[in-house]
Curated annotation (Swiss-Prot):
It is an enzyme of class 2 (transferase). GO terms for cellular component: cytosol; phagocytic vesicle. This is Transketolase. Catalyzes the transfer of a two-carbon ketol group from a ketose donor to an aldose acceptor, via a covalent intermediate with the cofactor thiamine pyrophosphate.
Length: 661
């Protein structure tokens, strides 16, 4: 913006240093290095360059700011406070305290103005790439020649640690290839990591690294010079190169505390003991948590300037809605909630022949869902041909086709997971992503953050057991499903036939308060007994009775996915006093009423056997000390899938034998 008051911005930068020092000192915990070293970056962005509205934090066309180096959270909280967001001085005083708005690392939903949950290094830059992708999709879908309602920038602040993490390379490679020119990376290049100087662990040329993947690079040698930073931002914002941008800022970690500045001791809270002298060095008064009247006045005026831009956009938006009622209706639909039962009605019942794999059933289910939810997008880590989650009526997302609904993430599972989170943070698109279940370990940190942040993403993970067969134990998950069930707020659904799969996808696409993981087979599975309606409705409750006993109940067989068929066959051999329960989603079943759970698994029947082609430990919560679990507590082997299953005891015959022991 014109008429830059550099004195005011420099004063604000120093006052955020004071806020950060006081907050970390009061908490006796936290990180000073980035908030002090990057204060001028904050001044250039929040005090001049970013377009935002603190009164409308979800404004559709705001610029996004993601703090990838989440340990520097006081940087963000300080600037949000000055910028007029609902982050008070009292909130800053409660930094890292119980139930505060200012947790140790930024958390989506907890703090107004925080765009992404960050802290695990590298996640934020991949989140930003996902957000930038979603912004491209939105612009492609909704902008017209007359009205550009989406033209924002996505800014992410990264440090040396973020860029050492492998996920960063996956993310920037995607961004460069897809020419995400709405992405601007600020690299706080202070040459220091927690343990030592960065030169002890890296010697790469950052300029060449980013240029090689398609970024336009600017190097700001005086990374604490506000004028240089603003100029660099404006150059990046108005670049005609069609490339994503990175501004490498050579900064001094913990600037303002000479005793630790420029060293690894400045990373954490070690500098707290020197803050009294630092306050004098920075020209700050002795008063703690001090913000001057001049700084508050500056930001009040700045907010008024931003409000003008906001109102201008609102006028354009109103014109756009009037001129494009169908597009306006589509945009509004992004915020509509959908019930699983309504989504499920869009999916025709399956013919009972031929038998098919649940991954194939998933493909058949995805097509009507994608028509019903036109703002849904689906991606894969170079496995669309195997995971079968390609939206057939949607083209590929490319620079030339930003409206494409199929995202080719490439063989970048970790970035895929974090980019999916970014698309979900954006909020307009329902995103799913696919790979083989065994490779979920590559993106588990992103799955965990999706669950923590209550992001409604959908994971479509196929080839879900030793039934994979010939590829062998490297590709045969055994511990994976149980491990994923341990993540709070993640619903894991392992359907047993196409009708259960229809309900599973409906649940996943309806869920708005967290992620859902679909575990699907490579191998064909028979249809379970019962009507499509019974199986679908039962799946919506997480677990249900597939085969009812016709004599006094003697035993309950519990299974998921490909093993339910063995329980059904075993029940035929064991007698009419056997009940078979399919439990595709234990998390959902656990959320049912006690009355319903007792109707399916009555506590009076303690003779229970659970069967799943994976580790056994998880299932004892359902079978109890008197029950048995048939599973696989070892790695698999390379052979045809049926042979591996038989060798490892995943058969109805083995189930019958164990039931008699």
């Amino acid at each position: 913006m014109s008429n830059i008051d550099f004195k005011a911005l420099e004063r604000a930068a120093n006052e955020t240093r004071g806020l950060s020092m006081d907050a970390v000192a009061k908490a006796a915990s936290g990180h000073l290095g980035l908030p002090l070293g990057s204060a001028e970056i904050g001044a250039a962005l929040f005090g001049n360059s970013l377009i935002y509205n603190p009164k409308d934090t979800r404004w559709l066309n705001r610029d996004y700011f993601v703090l990838s180096a989440g340990h520097g959270s006081m940087f963000l909280y300080s600037w949000l406070h000055l910028s007029g967001y609902d982050v008070s001085i009292e909130d800053i005083k409660n930094f890292r305290q119980l139930n505060s708005k200012t947790p140790g690392h930024p958390k989506f939903h907890d703090t107004p103005g925080v765009e992404a949950t960050t802290g695990p290094l590298g996640q934020g830059i991949a989140n930003a790439v996902g957000i930038a992708s979603a912004c491209k999709m939105a612009a492609g879908k909704f902008n017209t020649e007359q009205h550009q309602i989406f033209n924002q920038k996505v800014v992410v602040l990264v440090g040396d640690g973020c860029l050492q993490e492998g996920i960063s390379q996956e993310a920037i490679s995607f961004a460069g290839h897809h020419r995400l020119d709405n992405l601007i990376v600020f690299y706080d290049s202070n040459d220091v990591t927690l343990d030592a100087m960065a030169i002890e662990t890296q010697s790469e040329d950052a300029v060449k690294r980013f240029e090689s993947v398609g970024f336009e690079v600017q190097l700001v040698l005086e990374g604490n010079n506000i004028g240089s930073l603003i100029n660099a931002y404006q150059n990046a914002k108005h670049s005609k190169s069609g490339k994503p941008q990175i501004i490498i800022c050579k900064t001094t970690i913990a600037k303002g505390i000479p005793e630790v500045a420029g060293t690894n001791k400045g990373h954490g809270e070690a500098g707290v003991k020197f803050i009294d002298s630092a306050r004098k060095n920075l020209g700050l008064p002795e008063e703690k948590f001090f913000v001057s009247g001049e700084t508050r006045q500056y930001f009040e005026q700045h907010e008024k300037q931003l409000e003008k831009l906001y109102q201008e956009w609102q006028a354009t938006f109103a014109e756009w809605k009037s001129a494009n009622p169908k597009l306006a209706q589509l945009l509004e639909s992004a915020h509509e909630k959908h019930e699983a039962i309504d989504i499920m009605k869009q999916i025709p019942e399956f013919p009972t022949t031929p038998i098919i794999a649940t991954r194939k059933a998933g493909s058949d289910v995805l097509q009507p869902i994608s028509q019903y939810l036109p703002l849904s997008v689906s991606g894969s880590a170079d496995l669309h041909g195997s995971t079968l989650n390609y939206i057939k009526e949607g083209r590929d997302f490319t620079p030339a086709c930003p409206t494409g609904r199929n995202i080719k993430f490439g063989i970048r599972e970790h970035a895929m997971g974090a980019m999916m989170n970014g698309i979900a943070y954006h909020g307009l698109f329902k995103v799913s992503g696919a790979t083989f279940l065994v490779f979920s370990d590559y993106l588990r940190p992103a799955i965990r953050l999706a669950a923590l942040s209550h992001l409604p993403v959908v994971y479509i993970f196929t080839h879900d057991s030793v039934g994979v067969g010939e590829d062998g134990p490297t590709h045969q998950p055994v511990e994976t499903v149980s491990g994923l069930r341990m993540i709070p707020n993640l619903d894991v659904i392992r359907p047993a036939d196409p009708e259960e799969t229809a309900a599973a996808f409906s649940l996943a696409y309806a869920r708005a308060d967290g992620p859902t993981l679909l575990s699907l087979t490579r191998q064909n599975l028979p249809f379970l007994p019962g009507t499509a309606q019974k199986k679908r409705e039962g799946t919506l409750r997480g677990g249900y009775i597939v085969v009812s006993e016709t004599a006094p109940l003697r035993m309950i067989l519990i299974a998921t996915g490909s093993e339910v068929q063995h329980c059904v066959e075993a029940a035929k051999l064991l007698g009419d006093d056997i009940r078979v329960v399919s439990m595709p989603c234990t998390e959902l079943f656990d959320r049912q009423s006690n009355e319903y759970k007792q109707s399916v698994l009555p506590s009076g029947c303690r003779n229970r056997i659970a069967m799943e082609a994976g580790v056994t430990s998880f299932w004892y919560k359902y079978v109890g000390l008197d029950g048995k679990v048939i599973g696989i507590d070892r790695f698999g082997m390379s052979a045809p899938g049926n042979a591996v299953m038989k060798q490892l005891g995943m058969t109805s015959e083995n189930l019958v034998n164990i039931s008699k022991q």
